[in-house]
From Swiss-Prot:
This is 2-oxo-3-(phosphooxy)propyl 3-oxoalkanoate synthase. GO terms for molecular function: transferase activity. It comes from Streptomyces virginiae (Streptomyces cinnamonensis). It is an enzyme of class 2 (transferase). It holds the Pfam family AfsA. Involved in the biosynthesis of virginiae butanolide (VB), a gamma-butyrolactone autoregulator that triggers the production of the streptogramin antibiotic virginiamycin. Belongs to the AfsA family.
């Protein structure tokens, strides 16, 4: 019988947001995991018949938290600080079929750091297979810390809430979304710059209360910014490499800027997206799409 892993292991409140279904250790720092992607999802909606590539990033994120708790002894209540997260999806293998996609994941952990017996952080790389074919690759690096250290680090930021009222969203179609509630960008008077919309009531992007803007929200802002450059040309984010340099606070404006890079000879396009808050960079993302996605 197949079921999802306990939601607590992947830091999700809603069972519907859990994509991992099992795991086992295959070597000292190597693991085999299984996952399932639904044919339809309330937020990670298919793009031109292809699974949303950000579903790969969310699956990769869940891998790190699960292994930390289940295999590396990280206590519930410890906090995770994500430094980078990346994916590369093969759209020719990622088409939505007649049944949910059952995935097998090969995970290799490295740069494992400990403070005494406590895990302090690590890096891991993931290869995702579907039907024996590689559907995506990716990885991430993070630190983890005790609640006491996190409290000292965040201070009075713990418990902060977002900017109200929410700024007006862009038109959903201009950023590749169907619903206004799923739009995370708001227009500004400056070209290729938007204000981040932080809707803490969103049931997927804010699955549970947090005291900062989640990394997946920042990655979604990069995807939407890349699409907003030219809404008439679909932008399937087959590659994303995000780096998080500091917390993006909920209660201060965050500005998202996009810089289109020259297209490759084969039509592949890349956009560099950065997020700034109080004149400081909080994240950067290099996001790409294949020429065939146009």
């Amino acid at each position: 019988m197949t079921s999802t892993v306990p939601r607590e292991l992947v830091h999700r409140a809603a069972v519907a947001e859990v994509f991992l279904t099992g795991w086992s250790r295959t070597a000292e720092n190597r693991f085999a995991l299984t996952a399932q992607w639904p044919r339809a999802h309330s937020y990670f909606t298919p793009v031109n018949g292809c699974y949303d590539p950000l579903l790969a990033s969310e699956t990769i994120r869940q891998v790190g938290t699960l292994l930390s708790h289940a295999e590396f002894g990280v206590s519930f209540g410890d906090q995770f600080l994500m430094w980078d997260l990346h994916h590369s999806v093969r759209p020719e293998q990622a088409g939505v079929g007649a049944a949910p996609a059952d995935l097998e994941l090969d995970v290799i952990c490295s740069d494992i750091r400990r403070r005494g017996r406590r895990l302090a952080g690590m890096r891991y790389e993931v290869t995702l297979y579907c039907g024996g074919q590689v559907i995506a690759t990716g990885g991430a690096a993070f630190d983890c810390t005790s609640p006491a250290v996190y409290q000292r680090l965040r201070g009075d930021r713990v418990g902060a809430t977002g900017v109200r009222p929410l700024p007006q969203p862009l038109a959903p179609a201009s950023v590749g979304r169907f619903l206004t509630t799923d739009v995370v960008l708001s227009a500004t008077e400056r070209p290729l710059e938007w204000q981040l919309r932080v809707d803490e009531q969103h049931p997927v992007l804010f699955d549970h209360p947090v005291d900062h803007v989640p990394g997946m929200v920042l990655m979604e802002s990069a995807r939407q910014a890349a699409q907003a450059i030219d809404p008439s040309r679909p932008f399937l984010p087959t590659t994303m490499r995000s780096e998080f340099s500091r917390y993006a606070e909920l209660d201060r404006p965050c500005w998202i800027q996009a810089e289109p890079l020259p297209a490759a000879d084969n039509g592949d396009r890349q956009v560099r997206v950065t997020g700034h808050q109080d004149d400081t960079t909080v994240f950067s993302c290099l996001i790409g799409t294949r020429g065939a996605a146009e």
